[in-house]
C-alpha cells in the first residue's frame, strides 16, 4: 500500500486514445497499492467499447456529463449525468454515446490494473480534448480479448 497523496489537476493524468475515446488515468495501481484505479473517459459521439467482460475487476461508472447507452447482460440502460452503473466481474457490458455531444464518465476499477491494458492497447496522446481516430478492428479485438 502506498502512503503518498496524489492530486491530479483538470485535464491531468496519462491520456490514452482507445476505442475512439480518451481514457485519462487519474489514479493508477501504482498510486493505490493495487487497490483501485480511477479513469475519466471522454466518450465522443458514436464512441465506446465493444461488448466485453472483465474476469477480475468491478467497474463503477459515474456519468459526469452527457448521456451514455449501457448494455449490460443484454439489458439497455440510458445513463444520464448523475447516474451510477456498477458492473461486477463476469458480466458482458458495453457503453455507447448515441448523442451528438461529448459524454464524460468517471470509472472506478477495483482491483486496479486494467488501466495497464489501456496503455498497452491504446496510444498515448498529449491533448485529451481532441477526438482520436477510431480504433482498428484488430486492436479492438485485442482489447476485448485481453480485457477478459
Question: Model features per residue range: what roles?
Answer:
Residues 23-28, 39-54:
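Conserved short histidine dyad/triad with adjacent acidic residue
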Residues 1-35, 130-148:
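A short, N-terminal "cap"/entry segment at the start of jelly-roll beta-barrel domains
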Residues 56-68, 73, 82:
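Glycine- and acidic-residue-biased ligand/ion/polar-headgroup-sensing regions
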Residues 25, 38-40, 60, 76, ...:
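Conserved hydrophobic/aromatic beta-strand scaffold that supports enzyme active sites
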Residues 8-9, 74-92:
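Short acidic-glycine-tyrosine-enriched beta hairpin
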Residues 32, 89-115:
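Ligand-binding loop in jelly-roll beta-barrel domains
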Residues 104, 116-130:
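A hydrophobic, small-residue-rich beta->alpha segment in the mid-to-C-terminal subdomain
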